[in-house]
Regions:
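Glycan-recognition surfaces in beta-rich domains, encompassing non-catalytic CBMs
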Residues: 373-483
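A structural-propensity feature for long, helix-poor, extended segments
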Residues: 74-95, 338-368
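Alpha-helix capping and helix-loop boundary segments enriched in small/acidic/polar residues
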Residues: 32, 80-86, 120, 145-152, ...
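Bacterial Sec-dependent N-terminal signal peptides
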Residues: 1-21
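Catalytic phosphate/nucleotide-handling subdomain of diverse soluble enzymes
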Residues: 49, 56-69, 186-189, 197, ...
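Accessory "access/gating" subregions that flank catalytic or transport cores
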Residues: 27, 133-134, 142-151, 162-170, ...
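Active-site cavity-forming subdomains of large catalytic enzyme subunits
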Residues: 33, 37, 41, 45, ...
Length: 486
């Protein structure tokens, strides 16, 4: 009898779960497009607003009395002055193009090859991932910390916006795409940063406040991860001290400003770690109280990657409110460049608006939603928590040594530990002198000279790496496509 009763109870419980209604988001074609446009526009506005301060305030915030400019013609000015500023956008565009041409079910390998052979400048985890793929190291190995010391950097985080836009209110689908894309260049907290951003955008289509958006987005990141703990600290701190964002900034500085991986930032005040910069995103969303202007201003004034962070904040709020509700003060300068083509792509903002809209509708239908007669219905499903992955566990940098020398033949050094990173640049002396290179590179720790080659210089330096008398591997360092880190 006891067994029969138990079976009956389980059967009744299962029937009860199946009977629970699924929450559905209903909106019109026009409303969906408006939100998608708002995401792209807010993202681009944020990256331009933070342009003059990017990594110029490391270990400090920007004082309230210091003006940050914005005016008519300002977006066009930065478009012409520094095309590489828009890496937040053109990396997204590469993947949007890939999904458009290869289909929504395209493989990780197909996406990796599109990314690795895109003709624009990359840095940090993106550049290391590109190098790995071009050497035959495919994802997820290309983003693994043992092959990519930038694995915890925020690269995937700054190019994951498009995922939430093509998967509106569809968190499980957003995380599936994030897993395919994010492990091309990142892993661990670096991967979680992009998954978090994708979830922020996706949930912004139906959540009504920054608090709710953050709560939903962080719920998919494993609680055991340092990324989750860092973002949760921001949420908890804000609940206790909701008035002054600088108090939260100091708290984060003390507890979480500790990068152990990025070769450019280790032992320095430069921090491009995903969790710290995502924490600044969360901080700005909470203390900005949903106001577009205040939120991107706070995200910028937090410092470090102060163009990418307001870019994410602006994009998420752009989705929540929609394109038409972004203040004209911000939107009008953007409209000047909406038809301009991003570097290394065939994409403009105008094309991105439409392409993301089309992809979103395809994915909605594919996953059981409805698109009919100008009306859209999206079933909102619970997403599973991502698997736990952590980089650099029980691994810490021991020392940083500065050499400031040219490698023209051989270079030898001794080290203690289980690994090393040599960080530098390959430079062409056709147009500049070794003296100039030396003066720039020794200006301060972290100074670098961009690879000044002809635009299509085919030269590739071959550098043999020998360890304990045995050839470990041969590094191929191209002059083309911007700087090539040793």
């Amino acid at each position: 009898m006891r067994k029969i009763i138990t079976i009956c109870i389980i059967g009744l419980f299962a029937l009860n779960v199946q009977a629970q209604p699924v929450k559905t988001l209903k909106l019109s074609d026009k409303e969906l497009l408006d939100k998608i446009k708002g995401g792209w526009a807010g993202q681009t506005i944020g990256v331009v607003f933070g342009a003059p301060t990017e990594f110029k305030f490391t270990g400090t915030y920007i004082q309230d009395y210091q003006p940050i400019p914005w005016a008519e013609g300002y977006v066009k000015y930065w478009w012409e002055k520094k095309p590489g500023l828009f890496d937040d956008i053109y990396n997204d565009c590469t993947f949007v193009e890939a999904f458009d041409e290869l289909g929504l079910d395209c493989s990780q390998e197909e996406l990796a090859k599109r990314f690795a052979f895109a003709d624009y400048h990359l840095a940090h985890a993106n550049q290391a991932g590109r190098y790995n793929i071009r050497q035959g190291i495919m994802p997820p190995a290309s983003g693994h910390w043992l092959n990519n010391p930038h694995a915890d950097d925020l690269d995937f985080q700054i190019e994951a916006d498009f995922i939430g836009l093509m998967a509106p209110a569809m968190l499980p689908e957003a995380l599936d795409i994030a897993s395919r894309v994010g492990h091309i260049m990142n892993s661990g907290d670096g991967f979680y940063g992009g998954a978090f951003v994708a979830a922020l955008y996706s949930s912004a289509f139906y959540e009504k406040s920054p608090e709710a958006i953050l709560k939903t987005a962080i719920s998919v990141i494993p609680e055991e991860s340092t990324f989750h703990q860092c973002i949760q600290d921001v949420i908890n701190f804000h609940s206790l001290h909701p008035d002054n964002w600088k108090d939260c900034w100091y708290f984060l500085q003390e507890k979480w400003n500790c990068d152990v991986g990025c070769p450019k930032g280790v032992f320095l005040n430069f921090n491009i770690d995903a969790k710290l910069n995502s924490a600044f995103i969360a901080l700005a969303m909470l203390y900005g109280k949903g106001d577009f202007t205040n939120s991107i201003d706070i995200a910028t004034r937090c410092g470090q990657d102060s163009d990418c962070n307001p870019s994410t904040v602006g994009g998420v709020l752009g989705v929540m409110y929609g394109y038409d509700k972004i203040p004209s003060f911000w939107l009008n300068p953007l409209k000047e460049v909406e038809d301009f083509t991003f570097e290394g792509t065939n994409m403009s903002l105008a094309k991105a608006y439409q392409m993301s809209f089309d992809q979103a509708k395809q994915l909605i239908v594919k996953t059981g939603g409805k698109v009919s007669g100008g009306e859209i219905e999206i079933p909102i499903k619970r997403a599973d928590i991502l698997p736990l992955e952590q980089n650099f566990e029980k691994t810490y940098p021991l020392y940083r040594e500065r050499k400031d020398c040219f490698l023209t033949d051989t270079f030898e050094f001794d080290f203690n530990g289980n690994g090393f990173v040599i960080w530098g640049n390959i430079c062409c002396t056709k147009s500049i002198t070794p003296d100039y290179i030396n003066r720039v590179s020794t200006r301060h720790i972290g100074s670098e000279v961009f690879g000044l080659a002809e635009p299509n210089d085919p030269y590739v330096a071959k550098v043999e790496i020998w360890i304990d008398g045995e050839l470990d591997h041969v590094a191929a360092l191209p002059m083309k496509l911007g700087r090539a880190h040793v």
